[in-house]
Amino acid sequence: MVKLTSIAAGVAAIAATASATTTLAQSDERVNLVELGVYVSDIRAHLAQYYSFQVAHPTETYPVEIAEAVFNYGDFTTMLTGIAPDQVTRMITGVPWYSSRLKPAISSALSKDGIYTIAN
């Protein structure tokens, strides 16, 4: 016979390992901040590649907040609030390495934070 305490302990263990999940619209600011965090980290890691892309595509502009976040190694998330969702999407998907590098990293970061997205 299984004791109630064993069942309770098992349920508690499962609950402790299960992460809370949240479903948000792709344009939600929390989603944008995760995306921008990955983007800033990717720029830092591949700065020369982004410089080359900028030279080849001078009309692709970035908000000043992105540059400030890239070169400020403290907590930059508050700098990135207020960037319009369509601008976030344009910047992130506008680079050739979006599908191979950014998209998987963004998906991983959202999943790690328990965030799942739905189309707007």
From Swiss-Prot:
The keyword Nucleus does not apply. GO terms for cellular component: extracellular region; fungal-type cell wall. Residues 1-20 form the signal peptide. GO terms for molecular function: structural constituent of cell wall. One of its GO terms (biological process) is fungal-type cell wall organization. InterPro entries: SRP1_TIP1, Yeast_SRP1/TIP1_CWP. PROSITE patterns: SRP1_TIP1 (PS00724). O-glycosylated. It is found in: Secreted, Cell wall. Keywords: Cell wall, Cell wall biogenesis/degradation, Glycoprotein, Secreted, Signal. Induction: Induced during anaerobic growth and completely repressed during aerobic growth. It comes from the Eukaryota. Component of the cell wall. Belongs to the SRP1/TIP1 family. Seripauperin subfamily. This is Seripauperin-24.
